[in-house]
Amino acid sequence: MMFINLLLRLMCVFLIGADGQMVQMESSKAGFVGSQVELPCQFVNSNPPVKISQVTWQKLVNGTKQNVAIANPALGVSVLNPFRERVRFKNPAVRQRTPSLEDTTIVFNRLKLTDESTYICEYTTFPAGNRENMVNLTVFARPMIQMSLSTPSIVAGSKDLKMTVATCVSANGKPASVITWETDLDGESNTQEISNPDGTVTVRSDYFVVPSREIHQQLLTCISTYNEEQYTDSVTLNIQYEPEVIIEGFDGNWYLNRENVQLTCLADANPTISLYQWRYLNGTLPSSAELRDDVLIFKGPVTYDIAGTYVCDATNSIGSGSASVEVIVTEFPSYPHEVFQDQQQAGVVIGGAVVCGTVLLAAVTLLVVFLYRRRCMFKGDYSTKKQILGNGYSKAGNVPSHPSLPHSLTFSDDSDEEKKLELYRGSSILGGSVQEFHTCHDSRIKAYRTGLIEEHERCAFNEQTYIYEYGSEVEVSVDMIPQMDGSVISKEEWYV
């Protein structure tokens, strides 16, 4: 059949008559089952024109021609069985009383797999004779993708025995599909193809893995690739397994008189647990123990009576699982190392905050005291200098009639005022009387308004200011410090 098709194609792809007539067609067409497809056919009638007597569409079946549709100018249009309900001429002019047969394209509706074949469009002309061409129609079938678990529930078994957990089927596809698996499971697949009588192919792929609790609820995806199109379907594995049990609640710090302690039985199982049972290996359960399914509650304060080993048994339809815990009761609570570290860190933080607050308070206090003393001790112009007995000049800038002091008059803070006064009295240079300020009413005495005397009296420091008469008025305070150049400045200026 392939040889005949090839021969016909070589002869008829562009069959040109002696006068230039030919039939134009596409070499191949394709469609999916249930869809619609057009098979074009056009007649090129060159000069001189010829008369078209009839157009016949034929299906080539096993080397023989089977009529599909006929268009005759005199007899009209006819579509034969089994194509009558699904095949028609596309151009309405073909069906007119005076038809135009240059374009006799036919349309297939509800395409079937059996429609796949080679179709011939044949023109009968006068006087040129017959002209024809052919087209190959291919029909595709999209597969039905179905994925399922091997059984609704899979029971976990031996760790070395793999079993089929899921099956993916791409049924009745044309051409055949390619099946792959997408999953995190450590399994393998087995794929086989089955050819069907209608020319389609069914592909089946089974996935094998060792069923266990670890793969429960894992996703398994089947990917079917067909004609560069991908179809996916997924299932979630349902693995049944016996309970795996642990007991929580004992923290290693159950001490006498502790309140609200309990043990909880936690079980990982599929299906769920149907029965919980508690056992006390040291005898019967203590009187303070109360059973509430998976929880064992101890009422009242902790006593030595509840010490011992407790066992929880959990059961489901697949099997049973157990776990135990040994409860130890101590006289005093024990604090974990982590708690001690947290407390120590908290103490460091609190101590640091206290120290910082204390330092800040002390600094503020010192600052306030310093400012207050400074205000009490000196209120004047720091740039003021008092001449005293020895720089060779009077306050007005005149040369004094007496020689300058041979040395500076300097006193320490703790010098006795009587000694200071005696020293001044014994000096021949002074040559005058010394009087206390508060008893002196001489109008010739001029006190520089530094504010020292008044402020000292107001602050009650009991300090005395002495006035020395030597050509010009001079005042000296015990808080004033004589300098080498004969001037005297306050202690604050001296420190600066």
From Swiss-Prot:
Subcellular location: Cell membrane; Cell junction, Adherens junction
Gene Ontology annotations of biological process type: heterophilic cell-cell adhesion via plasma membrane cell adhesion molecules; homophilic cell adhesion via plasma membrane adhesion molecules; primary palate development
Pfam families on file: C2-set_2, Ig_2, V-set
All ranges on the Extracellular side of the membrane: 21-349
Classification via InterPro entries: CD80_C2-set, Ig-like_dom, Ig-like_dom_sf, Ig-like_fold, Ig_sub, Ig_V-set, Nectin/Nectin-like
Keywords from the named record: Cell adhesion, Cell junction, Cell membrane, Disulfide bond, Glycoprotein, Membrane, Repeat, Signal, Transmembrane, Transmembrane helix
Predominant place of localization: membrane
Spans through the membrane: 350-370
Superkingdom of origin organism: Eukaryota
Membrane disposition: Single-pass type I membrane protein
Effect of loss of the gene: Fishes lacking both nectin1a and nectin1b leads to defects in cell adhesion upon serum depletion. The absence of nectin1a and nectin1b also promotes melanoma spreading in melanoma models.
Ig-like C2-type domain residues: 143-238, 243-330
Keyword Disulfide bond included in the entry's annotation: yes
GO terms assigned for molecular function: cell adhesion mediator activity
Protein family (similarity comment): Belongs to the nectin family.
Subunit and interaction comment: Cis- and trans-homodimer. Can form trans-heterodimers.
Function: Cell adhesion molecule that promotes cell-cell contacts and plays important roles in the development of the nervous system. Acts by forming homophilic or heterophilic trans-dimers.
Name recorded for this polypeptide: Nectin 1a
Annotated gene: nectin1a
